[in-house]
Each structure stands twice: as structure tokens, then as C-alpha cells.
């Protein structure tokens, strides 16, 4: 199955594929730049993803040098969180972040999502964390909440 990077484990203290994460972020930087080159301003771009894709959305957007419209990260965690304070882009310090997680997620533990949320709050990011009574999936209420959040970000 294709993946953004190798996952060695999804528990606290698991080894992370730093080189793979950084390489995937560079690919996303290039993809964002292609969108900008095609006429879409950075402040109209939202990076979004589920699970490992959500991890890459968080990692990449928080380091991207131009302000984005938002970050949507579902059933995920913040990879290489210990580097964020040093590597973060000032451009996306105020970028709204929507995180959501299932209370019954048996793939990415809800505690990892909550830990990531707390890391972001500690660094004064504009982040909200929503929990839902589901596993590693998306539910109808989550889709309603995502829709409202997206409409708020892109109404301008």
C-alpha cells in the first residue's frame, strides 16, 4: 500500500522515519507551489489529510513559508513534534487548524491525537480538537463540522 513515509510504530516513543517525512514534505511543498503557479493564492489553500495524510498535512503546513487558509487533520498525530518549535514557519502561526479523532480509534490512538493537540496549544497555535464516538474513520457529524469549518475558512 502506498505511504508517505515508513511507520515504525504509532505509540509514544516510537522511532519516526525522519528522512521519509522530510522528503514527503518536500514533495508537498512542490505540489503547493504548482497550485500557486497556476493562480491559486496560498491563503486559499487548505492542506488536509486523514491518518498518515493528516500527519503530513500538519507537518508540511506548519513549516510552509507562506500563510495558508487552514489545516485539516483527521485521526492523526503530529510527526517529529520535538522539532516543531525550532522549524515552524511564522507565516502559519495563526493558520486555523481543525483536528478530529475517534474515541475508539485502534489505529492511531486518541491519546496521540490529543498529545499532538496539546503540543500545538502549548506553542500557541490556533487549533481545535474534536472527538467523535467512532474508530479510525469519519462520521456524519464530523463531516458537518468539517463543512462548516471549511466554509468559514473559504468564505472570503
Regions found by a protein language model. Give the residues of each.
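Primarily recognizes the serine-hydrolase "nucleophile elbow" in alpha/beta-hydrolase
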Residues: 41-92
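Short, proline-enriched alpha-helix->beta-strand connector loops that line the catalytic pocket
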Residues: 92-97, 123-126
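Short beta-strand/loop motif that positions the catalytic acidic residue
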Residues: 98-101, 105
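C-terminal catalytic histidine-bearing segment of alpha/beta-hydrolase fold enzymes
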Residues: 111-156
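Serine-hydrolase catalytic machinery in alpha/beta-hydrolase-like enzymes
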Residues: 1-44
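Amphipathic, non-transmembrane alpha-helical secondary structure
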Residues: 22-29, 33, 62, 144-147, ...
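Short, glycine/charged-enriched secondary-structure capping and boundary segments
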Residues: 1-2, 61-65, 85-89, 112-115, ...
